UniProtKB/Swiss-Prot annotation:
Keyword Protease carried by entry: no
EC number: 2.4.1.218
Record-stated family: Belongs to the UDP-glycosyltransferase family.
SUPFAM superfamilies: UDP-Glycosyltransferase/glycogen phosphorylase
Record field: catalytic activity: hydroquinone + UDP-alpha-D-glucose = hydroquinone O-beta-D-glucopyranoside + UDP + H(+)
InterPro entries in the cross-refs: UDP_glucos_trans, UDP_glycos_trans_CS
Positions with a binding annotation for UDP-alpha-D-glucose: 343, 345, 360, 363-365, 368, 384-385
Species of origin: Rauvolfia serpentina (Serpentine wood)
Recorded superkingdom: Eukaryota
Keywords for this protein: Glycosyltransferase, Transferase
Active site: 17, 114
Purpose: Broad spectrum multifunctional glucosyltransferase. In addition to hydroquinone it accepts at least 45 natural and synthetic phenols as well as two cinnamyl alcohols as substrates. Hydroquinone was however the best substrate. In contrast to this broad acceptor substrate specificity, only pyrimidine nucleotide activated glucose is tolerated as a donor substrate.
Official protein name in the record: Hydroquinone glucosyltransferase
Amino acid sequence: MEHTPHIAMVPTPGMGHLIPLVEFAKRLVLRHNFGVTFIIPTDGPLPKAQKSFLDALPAGVNYVLLPPVSFDDLPADVRIETRICLTITRSLPFVRDAVKTLLATTKLAALVVDLFGTDAFDVAIEFKVSPYIFYPTTAMCLSLFFHLPKLDQMVSCEYRDVPEPLQIPGCIPIHGKDFLDPAQDRKNDAYKCLLHQAKRYRLAEGIMVNTFNDLEPGPLKALQEEDQGKPPVYPIGPLIRADSSSKVDDCECLKWLDDQPRGSVLFISFGSGGAVSHNQFIELALGLEMSEQRFLWVVRSPNDKIANATYFSIQNQNDALAYLPEGFLERTKGRCLLVPSWAPQTEILSHGSTGGFLTHCGWNSILESVVNGVPLIAWPLYAEQKMNAVMLTEGLKVALRPKAGENGLIGRVEIANAVKGLMEGEEGKKFRSTMKDLKDAASRALSDDGSSTKALAELACKWENKISST
């Protein structure tokens, strides 16, 4: 049996959950000499991008794929959060076997799950392994998770129907309509899953959150206040992925950026899981054209049914460029580059020519922007992204959020004005300055004596003591 402390990590489905958890694992291995094994539940073959990502894990980080669970009994319209929770629940016998093997072969100090994975705590408790949560998004959203059981009892109607903003401890007031998606329909199984998970958060011995003190001082202060039964919270971020694949080196888009003036390009991407409707796709294209700004757009095929259309499968089969308005490519020639499906986001955001980012407000994307000091246009699509947009626009004041019309679409003029405002306007200058301050704060948090580095060291010390006392 090896003598280094070992951590088991159980991610829920989705690259957005896996990427920061892997970055966390790398820090434990490289800085604190831990071993990590990912226990990965599945519901079928892994998407190619996820398989490549896992196969590139460094020494000291291993993974085991669990047998696929079946969802044949679920209706076609089951919500994504329900499916994520059930992936864990239905995999528990396999998680148990994997943990049993690790206990026999390693010094297992903790079982770490992510935000919807607390049903795996049953296995940790059975084997007397410390249960922890890695929370991949904001401290604001984590504060809502802790507050939700109380809110559930206090509010009788749908949260979106409460006329005044709701107060989450430590956070700016937020309207119920901007709560995370599964809280929008309290009769749906997805809300029941959310509430079930939230109630189990107090079973954790600690929660690591992918944020840092200067980014979210209010929510973190509220979370770290003494409260009977609330676990300690460790802000260890920003944990972001460094693009290091070979296809980055000769990427056409980086060569194109090299030829553009400094800070002149708006980057547009809706993340690995996001899609907009066909009509919205057209308005976005025409708005970008009207703005007369340079832009680099990761184009994915529109989807009229769901905003998280590519969440479980990053490959996008259709030719997205075929959906563009007629003549669009000719009219924007020379000032735009369209990239189908994938682009090296971290490299693009760190490039000197990139001056703004139109984002779906996924937390990984926001953190990458913060680390590179790039101001934003907030275009939330699903999950907790509306909450993130409120935080960016009203809390941090680093983003514009174009408004949708009565038909639910954000119109081309509104889009053009937002793009011009960010890239050329006074507001854009203010956002850029604030983002520069946050970039410096992020760098300080990750420095040798920074707050996030210290929080990780405190956690590692706790886990080391755990195995030395057993």
